[in-house]
Amino acid sequence: MEQQQKQEPGGGGGGVRVVARICPCAPPPPPPDAALNFQVAALNDPALISFIPRRPTASAATAAASGRGDGPKDKQQQQQQKYRVDGCYLRDDPNHRVFHNEVKPLIDGRGGGGGGRGGAKACVVACGDAAAKRHLFMGSPDQPGLFTMAMAQLLDSSKAIGAAVTVSSYQVLQDTHILDLLEPKNHEVLILEDADGQTHLKGLSRVGVNSIEEFSQLCCCATNQQRHHPAKDSTQLQDWGHQGLIIYVSSFDQQGKECALAKINFLNLAGYVDPKQKKNEGLALLTGNKSMHALMNVVQALNSNQRFVPYRQSKVTRILQDSLCKSKTSGSVLIACLAEDCCQDSVSTLALASRSSQVVNEQYYSLSLSAKKSSKSNMNLPTDAKTLSRTFIHKTMSMQEKNARPGFNNSGVKGGQTPTANRRTQPIISSTKKSGSSICTSIKMKENYAKPKISGRKLFCPSNNSLKEENATDVASTVVTETKSATVRIQADEVQPLVGMEIRAALLNEGCSEIGNTGDVKSSEMQEVVHCSTQELLASTIQEEDYALSNMEPENSCTDMGLTCSSITDNLVEKTPASSTLSSPKLSDRLREISNSLKLLSTRPVSVRAEKWDIECARRINTIAPEPKTPEVHLKFEQAEDPKDKLTARSTGIKKSLAQECLTFLNSANKEQLKSLKGIGDKRANYILELREESPELFKEISDLRDIIGMNSKEIKKMMSGIIDP
C-alpha cells in the first residue's frame, strides 16, 4: 500500500497515463460454460500485473486426455503473461484514491473553475470488465464513483466564479451510429470540427445541473435509455456499445455570449471480445474491437511522440480528438478495469493497454536511441576499409579451405602426377586476373619480387608433408638462408618470365582493344587488385620453393635454357618447401602491404580518352534517301470580319497607346515641356514636379489627371486633341 501511494499522479505530463484497476466488488456468479482461466495479481512492483493460470476446465481436461492439450510452449507462455502499466490500484484501494491520483489533477489543472485556463479539456477512458467499469464510474452505496466525485468538485468550483455546469450523454453503436441518451431524437448526432480543430456534436442535447441529486437522476435516465435503445442488427447485443458522458463548464460575458472554460469527457468503452472463442459467434464483434484498437493506437501514438495520430480510424477517437491529445491544456488517463477472476478477454485488453502505456513506450524509445547510436558508430568507419577487410578475409578463408584438403598435401599424390595433370595445375600457379593495363601489372610484379617470399609461405600455403620430407628439407633451408640475397636477385631475373607468362600473353591480346576503353571503374579496379595480390602471394610461395630446389639439385636448375614449362612444373610439384619451419607473418602486415599497393595504384591516371573512329562508328549517318512525298498545304478559311469592327478595334488600340505615351510624358517631362500641353499652366506644372519628387511614377491612368491635379474631362479631351493636332 505504501508503494501504491507513491505512484506518480496523472495529469500534467502531456501524455496519456495507462493504469489498471482491480475491481473491489464481488463479481456476479459466472455462467456454467464460462472459462475463468486466470487470476489477476499484482507483483512486488506496483505497476506489474500478472495473470496466474488456474486449473484447467472440464473441456480443457478432456482435450488434454485426448492428446489435444497445450504443449510445453503454450504452458510456458501462460506462465509468462506479465504486463507493465503506469500504475495499478488493488482491490483494497477505494475509488476515492483513484479519483485523487488520476482524475482530480485533471480537473484542477484543466479548468473547472479552479484557476485553469479557458477552453481546457480532459479525458477519462475506462475499458475492460463491465462490472468493474460500472463500479468505477457509478460507484456503490458504500463509496461514490468517479462521476459523482467529479461533478461535486466541479459544482463547488463553478459556484465560486459564477459558471454554469451542463452535461451530455451519448452512445456509439457499431462505430457508425451516435445516439443521444438524455433527449432521444429521430435523427442521429453528427461530428463536426471547426477551424480551430475543436470537436462539436451537432444534435446532442445539453442539460443544466445544479446539484448532485439532479445529476444522479440524469445518470439513471441515461442508463435506462441505453438499455431500451433498439438494436441495429439482430445479431447485435442491446448493451453492446460505447457510452460517453461530457461535462461542460462555461460562463457568460456581459453581451450574453457563452465562453467555454472546461470540457471533461468520460468514456465507458465496450469490452473486448476474443473472436476466437466459439461462444462469441454471431456477435457483431468487428466494430467493437475496431474501436478499442483505434483508441489504443491513438494512445500509443501520443505516448511514443509520433507525428501522425490516427484519429480518423474510429468515431470514438474523433469525438475525443480535442481532449485526447498532447497539449498544455489537456490531460488524459486510460483505466483498464479487471476482475479478480477473469478470462482471455481481460488478458487481451490489458495487453493492448500495456502496449500503449508510457513506461513501455519510454523503454522502446531508449532502445531505439541506443540502436541509432550503434548504427551511427558503424557508419563512421570508412567504406573502403570495410570492403577491403571483408574481401581480404573472404579470400584468405577460401584459400585456407582449399589448402586444408588432404589430397593436395599428400606427397604420394604429388609424386604420381602425370605431365597432363601438371599442366592442368599450371593456371593455378602462374595465372592471375587480368588487370586494366600493363602499368598495373608491372607495378604489382615489381613489388611482389621486392618482398621476402619466405614470409608469406605458411599463411597461405600450409603443408602437411611426411616426416622424411621435413628432414630432407632441413639442409635446403640452411642453403637458402646463406644465399638469401642471391636468391632474390635470381627470382627477379629468371622466375619472372615463368610467373608472368600468361599475364604478358594476355596483355598482348588486349593491346588492340585497350585503346578503345574509355576508363576503368574504381570499385572494380580495387577488387581486381585484391584478387591479384592474393594470386601473387601464391605465386611467390611456389617461386621460393623452386629456388630452394635449384640449390639442392643443380641439374634441374631454372637457369637451363632447354628446360620446358612442363618439367619446371613437375619440379615445383615434387619439391619440398624450404620454409615450413618459419613463422607466418601477421595479418596486419599483409593488410598494410596490400593497402600500400592500392595507394600506389590510385595515383595512376585513369584513361578517359576515346578514339575518333569510335565516335564516328557510334554516330552512323543514315544514307538512305527518304521517299519523296507531295507537300501538304493546309488552307485556313476564315470568315471576313466586319470593317466597322476592325476599325473599332484598331481605334481602341490607338487610344490606349496614345494615353500610355501621354502618361509617360507627364511622368518624365520638365516644367517647360509640361506647360506646352493644353490645360497645364505654371501652377499645375510646379505642382506636378513637387509630387513627382515623392513618387516618380505619379500618373498611372488617365483618371489620375482628374484626381491629382483637378482636370475635368473637357480639359483632358482638349489636351489629348492638342497632342494629336499641335
Curated annotation (Swiss-Prot):
Composition skew (Polar residues), residue ranges: 408-423
Record's GO cellular component terms: cytoplasm; kinesin complex; microtubule
Pfam families: HHH_3 (PF12836), Kinesin (PF00225)
Domain Kinesin motor: 15-359
Leader sequence segment: none
GO BP terms in the entry: microtubule-based movement
Stored InterPro entries: Kinesin-like_fam, Kinesin_motor_dom, Kinesin_motor_dom_sf, P-loop_NTPase, RuvA_2-like
Transmembrane spans: none
GO molecular function, one term: ATP hydrolysis activity
Region described as Disordered: spans on this chain: 1-20, 60-82, 402-423
Keywords associated with the record: Microtubule, Motor protein
Top-rank taxon, per record: Eukaryota
PROSITE patterns reported in the protein's UniProt record: KINESIN_MOTOR_2 (PS50067)
Family: Belongs to the TRAFAC class myosin-kinesin ATPase superfamily. Kinesin family. KIN-10 subfamily.
Protein name: Kinesin-like protein KIN-10B
Gene expressing this chain: KIN10B
